[in-house]
Amino acid sequence: MPSSRIPALCLGAWLLLLLLPRFARAEGAVPIPVTCFTRGLDIRKEKADVLCPGGCSLEEFSVFGNIVYASVSSICGAAVHRGVIGTSGGPVRVYSLPGRENYSSVDANGIQSQMLSRWSASFAVTKGKSSTQEATGRAVSTAHPPSGKRLKKTPEKKTGNKDCKADIAFLIDGSFNIGQRRFNLQKNFVGKVALMLGIGTEGPHVGLVQASEHPKIEFYLKNFTSAKDVLFAIKEVGFRGGNSNTGKALKHTAQKFFTADTGVRKGIPKVVVVFIDGWPSDDIEEAGIVAREFGVNVFIVSVAKPIPEELGMVQDVAFVDKAVCRNNGFFSYHMPNWFGTTKYVKPLVQKLCTHEQMMCSKTCYNSVNIAFLIDGSSSVGDSNFRLMLEFVSNIAKTFEISDIGAKIAAVQFTYDQRTEFSFTDYNTKENVLAVLANIRYMSGGTATGDAIAFTVRNVFGPIRDSPNKNFLVIVTDGQSYDDVRGPAAAAHDAGITIFSVGVAWAPLDDLRDMASKPKESHAFFTREFTGLEPIVSDVIRGICRDFLESQQ
């Protein structure tokens, strides 16, 4: 938009706000109770009186613009931002307005509104008519309104598809090469994919970047958490033109899009789906390297591959193989053209929801199963047992524990074995550490061999198909009364890497017999229980080293 038009738009907005009170002298209707999640687009009237609850100044209630707000904004959040109501809520009058461009970002009254390049409808707010109803710190019940009619309840935010956890950026082609018509077909396809993903607060989150002469982030992961809002946002994206510069756009997306401030979630795979119509106009290999370094899984959706006569214009005919996360066929996807693409939606969604295949997100911190086998024999003693638990906790807290990330389990042994918790019992670091801290000391003899066999069978057995790499960390202070070599060898054969940590009277021969190869880097010993702390970093480094070697 020309800069000369911006002051005119701002002046128009101010004149509109000055005139609004003249039109506000209406019938004394009772304000309709709404929630903080109610948006401008939920109000179907040109003018409406609503009653906002308190607590609508939180960041989750998104606001786009200043003075004039995009209709996707929270009404009550906008009212707080505008200064019409305070944090305790109150009556608000809402006026529906046409759409516009360049909704500005302004920090006002404790709310940082967000920028939006364009939206199809807007609204403005003024102070509403007072009523006998008063806003409280919670949403007002709409079960029995004064009119006696049941009001339609504002729907709560959907959790989404919990089996498809991913933070996804769609990088669409906005170049002159694709043109306006195919650009719109591309947007329709992306909308269908977004709808099938099952977007929600606990499911996939999506954002959109347009590749053109200069890349533009159209909206971030945090902006929308419902499919309906995402579809609206995709519809409003305008065609930019210019060269595609896909490499430049991919690099920009990898570096700028996936941050905590823009809504990326810890432990969730980061994905970029790159749409290329024909071929990129710049080098894309370096951008693919940068994306992998940032832990981003790059998918390439190529449309209308170059014909033999056009190959001379392509900088690198192997651009797909060099840009994707892994050149194994999983991360590349081809469609012959933009017509009749519905049949391609589901296969792409299935790929995006297969988190165990997201190789570029896999690290030693989020893709391992670690079981701790803890000696609870009488020779340890209660105070030293607490030091052993502290050692275990210090290792466990380093890893990204989640339902799709690292898993932790613990078994205590004497002559008997007790599963303190299995891999599937706790999916958060906080819960794992809390349970570890409260394990009760058993006391008894030492049968380490039986304990290894028990752990392989009962702890690792149920998760034998897990994509994570398996590790067993054994902590013991004495000689086992049974053989450890046979059970340890069986564990090695089952793909379990063993680290043995001995204290005090633990025989070095037993530690080496249990440890994986090379023995020198998988077996550790300390004379005192206080000497366990320095070994924490050795075990963590060893786990990461073994994990990286397994990925090569």
Swiss-Prot record:
Disulfide links within the chain: C36-C52, C56-C76
For this chain's UniProt record, which GO biological process terms are given?
Answer: regulation of cell shape; sensory perception of sound
* Keywords for the protein's UniProt record, in alphabetical order: Disulfide bond, Glycoprotein, Hearing, Repeat, Secreted, Signal
PROSITE patterns, per database record: LCCL, VWFA
Gene3D superfamilies the UniProt entry points to: LCCL-like domain, von Willebrand factor, type A domain
Q: Which GO terms describe its cellular component?
A: extracellular matrix; extracellular region
Q: What is this protein called?
A: Cochlin
**Species per Swiss-Prot/TrEMBL record:** Mus musculus (Mouse)
Q: Which gene encodes it?
A: Coch
